[in-house]
Every structure is written in C-alpha cells, then in structure tokens.
C-alpha cells in the first residue's frame, strides 16, 4: 500500500488528528498512477538530487525517494513534520526541512546533500496561492537547478507556457521563458485530491537554458517593459507605454524614437510581441533615455 492510496491517506490523517489549513493551500494527491507519471516526467534516477516543496504527508516524496539519490523536502506546516517522520521512516535518503522555501538559505541547504555535486531537480505540488512567487524565487536564484517538474493550477501552467498572440500569453510567460523552456506535460483532474480543489491542475516541465533566451542591456528594465505592456491587455502598446512613462511631448518623442529603432508599431498590443521583440524594445527605449 502506498501513502497516496486513499485509505492510507485517510488513516494517516485520522491517526494524527490532522485538519487542513486553507491558508497553506493544502490538497493531497491520492492517485499513485499520477505520482509515478510525475517521477517519470522528471526522469528521476540515482544520479539526481531532488528538492521537493510542500511534501504534505509524503505521497510524492515516497516515489521520489525510491528513485532519487536524495530528497530534500521543504514543509512550512510544522504539524506535518512528525507525520512525515512517521510515513517516511523507512527512507534514509530524505531530509525534511521545516521552513518556508521563500525564506530558506538554499545555497547553504543544498550543501547538506550527501553528494552535493549531483544535478538538482525541483519537483513539487505547489500551493495555488503562492505558485508564482515560489517559481520566480527559484528561477532567479543562483542555485544550479537543472529542471523543474511542478504541479500547479492549470490556468497558471497555460500562462507560463503560452506563445505570443494567445490569450494566456503575458509578462509571466516572458519572465519564465527568458530563463527556461516550459511545456505542459499532462493535466491532473481535481477529483484525485483530498480535499478536492475547485480547478484542475497541470504538470509543467521546465528546463533551465544554458543562457537566457535573449541578450538584453538591462534585465530589470526588460522585465519592467514587458510587465507594463500587459497592464491593460486590450490597450495598445502605445497607451500602456504612455500610461507608465508619461505623456509629455519629450516623453512621447522618446517613445516614438524607441519604437522606430525597434521597428515596432505603436498600434499593436503587447500580446503580439515575442520575447525577442520585447528585448529589442527595451534596449531601444533604454538607448533613447527612458
């Protein structure tokens, strides 16, 4: 019997008197086929260390520990730590860290792996309410994560992996795809969780690029330009740019010059621009003094 078997999950929760906290976005997976599929998608083997975020009662951790060299699982809910000690007692390659992943000193933590030189993959069932902050925190960190295989709300996975000229495409797509390739691996129905969430989930597979997708003069400015271009999705690029930078004659002249330099029409919307287009636009606007 697996931890994820519904009867085992229920017995563990009952034995420990555990009640779900909405503030932690807790939904425990009870489908062993999907758990195996996650491990297969992540291509976990004995030559890989895994960082897991939000192990819950250890359903996914069990599968990871059977395949990986070592698993370091970050759990913010201290009520789950003794439960994990119980459910994972047969594994000597699992470290449970009772800490918020956003506050963890990951540079120090990864040195605690028995073999810290192995490639590191992140595998997680992320709480819906904090998916984006966790992802961007990890992606922008200097930790050498090779790959992310992460379960999240389907809508967010679609936004991250979206292409230009689609409804889902936006600044989040650009922020992630600048650093990573991103592809939805498969959909996870809401019915396989306890308690069941209101929406379906998706497994998103992301691979870190050797170099960012494009080279830009100023990364912060590039991300700022991409964000402001989607503030009002139905407005033109020109309207979003002037709303942010201002509408004085001097500013408008600089914007016109920057758009001309980048060879981008002011009348299009942000969703029509590729990441490469945004790179050219940001560099051009920087060049004209914005």
Swiss-Prot record:
Matches recorded under Pfam families: RrnaAD
GO terms for MF: 16S rRNA (adenine(1518)-N(6)/adenine(1519)-N(6))-dimethyltransferase activity; RNA binding
Amino acids binding S-adenosyl-L-methionine: 27, 29, 54, 75, 100, 125
InterPro entries: KsgA/Erm, rRNA_Ade_diMease-like_C, rRNA_Ade_Mease_Trfase_CS, rRNA_Ade_methylase_Trfase_N, rRNA_adenine_dimethylase, SAM-dependent_MTases_sf
Chief location bin: cytoplasm
Keyword Phosphoprotein attributed: no
Catalysed conversion reaction: adenosine(1518)/adenosine(1519) in 16S rRNA + 4 S-adenosyl-L-methionine = N(6)-dimethyladenosine(1518)/N(6)-dimethyladenosine(1519) in 16S rRNA + 4 S-adenosyl-L-homocysteine + 4 H(+)
Superkingdom in the source lineage: Bacteria
Function: Specifically dimethylates two adjacent adenosines (A1518 and A1519) in the loop of a conserved hairpin near the 3'-end of 16S rRNA in the 30S particle. May play a critical role in biogenesis of 30S subunits.
Family membership: Belongs to the class I-like SAM-binding methyltransferase superfamily. rRNA adenine N(6)-methyltransferase family. RsmA subfamily.
HAMAP family: 16SrRNA_methyltr_A
PANTHER family in alphabetical order: DIMETHYLADENOSINE TRANSFERASE, DIMETHYLADENOSINE TRANSFERASE-RELATED
Name of the protein this chain belongs to: Ribosomal RNA small subunit methyltransferase A
Organism whose genome encodes this protein: Streptococcus pyogenes serotype M3 (strain ATCC BAA-595 / MGAS315)
Lineage of the species this protein comes from: Bacteria, Bacillati, Bacillota, Bacilli, Lactobacillales
